[in-house]
């Protein structure tokens, strides 16, 4: 591996922040990969919950966009992007919509915690630009995602999922499908 040439635009950008951004990029890509796995699982012919598949595919795209936004920031600040291997999802069989939503909730909380730690690092290193970036583009969105997933988990449980097979079908159709006829 060759060493990156020094940046002429770098200013008030600590090496620890640069390294943390690279770790966050990896975590966002991992989240995208997990959501893609979930989407493909629900699209299988023996699962056939198309709106769960669409929902998780949308989440996958969103997480990839988060990673790309961080990459753009890294370049704007004069940092260097060092991509690492993306860890494989912990499972291939997501078992049920409820289980997948619970895993997604846990994942979003992990991503949020990592962002909070990145924000603390930026604060400690006196980097107001990075603090503003995280606050503007990530923190509110994370809280909304966590709330939405928590609501989905609650509603699936109230409906009797996963024991009541009809519950996930109805949730797929009326909540994730917004009542679509198909």
Swiss-Prot record:
Residues 11-160 form the Ferritin-like diiron domain. It catalyses: 4 Fe(2+) + O2 + 4 H(+) = 4 Fe(3+) + 2 H2O. Fe cation 2 binds at residues 63, 108, 142. The modification N-acetylthreonine is found at residue 2. One of its GO terms (biological process) is intracellular iron ion homeostasis. Fe cation 1 binds at residues 28, 63, 66. InterPro entries: Ferritin, Ferritin-like, Ferritin-like_diiron, Ferritin-like_SF, Ferritin_CS, Ferritin_DPS_dom. PROSITE patterns: FERRITIN_1 (PS00540), FERRITIN_2 (PS00204), FERRITIN_LIKE (PS50905). Its main location: cytoplasm. Its EC number is 1.16.3.1. This is Ferritin heavy chain. It comes from Mus musculus (Mouse). The gene is Fth1.
């Amino acid at each position: 591996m060759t060493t990156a040439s020094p940046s002429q635009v770098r200013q008030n950008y600590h090496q620890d922040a640069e390294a943390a951004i690279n770790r966050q990029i990896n975590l966002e890509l991992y989240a995208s990969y997990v959501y893609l796995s979930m989407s493909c699982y629900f699209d299988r012919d023996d699962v056939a919950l198309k709106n769960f598949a669409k929902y998780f595919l949308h989440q996958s795209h969103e997480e990839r966009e988060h990673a790309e936004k961080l990459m753009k920031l890294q370049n704007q600040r004069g940092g260097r992007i060092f991509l690492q291997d993306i860890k494989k999802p912990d499972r291939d069989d997501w078992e049920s919509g409820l289980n997948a939503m619970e895993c997604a909730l846990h994942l979003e909380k992990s991503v949020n915690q990592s962002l909070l730690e990145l924000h603390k690092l930026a604060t400690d290193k006196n980097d107001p630009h990075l603090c503003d970036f995280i606050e503007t583009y990530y923190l509110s969105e994370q809280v909304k995602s966590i709330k939405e997933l928590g609501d989905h988990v609650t509603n699936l449980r109230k409906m009797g999922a996963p024991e009541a097979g009809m519950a996930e079908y109805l949730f797929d159709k009326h909540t994730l499908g917004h009542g679509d006829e198909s």
